[in-house]
């Protein structure tokens, strides 16, 4: 028995969603090959925003992609349910990157002040995020602004990435620690 995700009808509907995004956003959504866009995805591209994919991408159900800046995605990219990528400035994702469920990748923090015992939000502080090639980001990871993740990296579940990660490592924890060197 086939699951609905493997049925040809589901694939056709996903490709129609991709086509609708190409029509809706025009040159702001560059994805050269038909891609799988799941149900209830929030894909928002604002005035100066762009989403540029190198090749076909797989975006599972209930994912949010938010581009006020540039979101660049490499080949062989997949993102799973309930994850979000929010680019106010720039997020670059390399080739062969897989993102688990409930992952957040953010290139900004909120800027705020305390005035007369009242919290006042004053925009955002941004810094680019770069994720290398051959990276697996497990469930519930959070990647914060200004981070560079090297090539051939595995992020364990629930990892908080707040500083740069070297290549060829397995990391985990909150904040993260290097758990293993990959050869």
Where are these regions (language model features)?
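Beta-rich strand-turn-strand
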Residues: 86-87, 139-154, 159-163
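Conserved catalytic-core motifs of eukaryotic protein kinase domains, centered on the activation segment
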Residues: 109, 116-117, 181-182
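A short acidic, glycine-rich active-site loop
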Residues: 118-129
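Domain-scale signature associated with acetyltransferase and cell-envelope carbohydrate enzymes
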Residues: 1-106, 132-133, 141, 167, ...
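Short, conserved secondary-structure segments in the cores of folded domains
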Residues: 47-49, 69, 127, 145, ...
């Amino acid at each position: 028995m086939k699951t609905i995700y493997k049925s040809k009808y589901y694939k056709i509907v996903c490709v129609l969603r991709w086509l609708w995004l190409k029509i809706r956003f025009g040159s702001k959504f560059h994805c050269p090959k038909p891609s799988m866009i799941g149900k209830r995805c929030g894909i928002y591209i604002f005035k100066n925003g762009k989403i540029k994919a190198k090749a076909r991408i797989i975006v599972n159900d209930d994912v949010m992609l938010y581009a006020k800046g540039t979101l660049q995605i490499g080949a062989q990219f997949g993102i799973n349910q309930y994850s979000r990528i929010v680019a106010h400035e720039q997020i670059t994702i390399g080739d062969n990157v897989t993102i688990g469920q409930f992952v957040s990748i953010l290139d900004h923090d909120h800027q705020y002040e305390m005035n007369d015992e009242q919290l006042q939000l004053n925009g955002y502080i941004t810094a680019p995020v770069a994720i290398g090639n051959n990276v697996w980001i497990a469930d519930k990871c959070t990647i914060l602004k200004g981070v560079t993740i090297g090539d051939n990296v595995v992020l364990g579940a629930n990892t908080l990435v707040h500083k740069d990660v070297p290549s060829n490592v397995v990391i985990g924890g909150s904040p993260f620690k290097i758990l293993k060197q990959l050869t």
